[in-house]
Amino acid sequence: MSEYKSVQKGSLKLKGVSLPSKKKKKKNKEMKRLEEQVLTSENEEGTKKAYVDKRTPAQMAFDKIQEKRQMERILKKASKTHKRRVEDFNRHLDTLTEHYDIPKVSWTK
C-alpha cells in the first residue's frame, strides 16, 4: 500500500500549455448597447422605401400568364375524383392496340 501513497492525483500538466483561464462574463452594458442598435436598425428599415419591382413589363406579363395557367391546371386536376381518373385511364387503355396491352387498373385496390 505504501507504493500508492506517492501517486499524484489530478489532471496531467503538459509543458508549454498554460492553464485555461475562465472566460469573463459579458457585462450588461454591451447587451444594452446591442439592443439599442437593433432597435435603431429596425426603425431605419421601416423608413426605407418599399421593394421596387425591377422586372420588365414582358417579365411581369409572363409571370402573370404562368400563374394563370398553373391555376387552370390545378383546377382541372382537382375537378376529377380518383375513381373518375381511373375510369378515363381504362377507357384510354381500351383504345390502344394490343401491342400496348396491360391489365386494367382497379380503383378499389
Curated annotation (Swiss-Prot):
Compartments reported by the entry: Nucleus
GO process annotations (BP): apoptotic process
Compositionally biased spans, kind Basic residues: 21-30
GO CC, alphabetical: nucleolus
Residue stretches spanning the membrane: none
Residue ranges of the region described as Disordered: 1-48
Keyword annotations from UniProtKB, A to Z: Apoptosis, Cell cycle, Nucleus
InterPro entries in the cross-refs: FAM32A
Keyword hit for Nucleus: yes
Biased composition (Low complexity): 9-20
UniProt superkingdom: Eukaryota
Role played: May induce G2 arrest and apoptosis. May also increase cell sensitivity to apoptotic stimuli.
Family stated for the protein in its record: Belongs to the FAM32 family.
Protein name (record): Protein FAM32A-like
Organism from which the protein derives: Danio rerio
Lineage, uppermost ranks: Eukaryota, Metazoa, Chordata, Craniata, Vertebrata
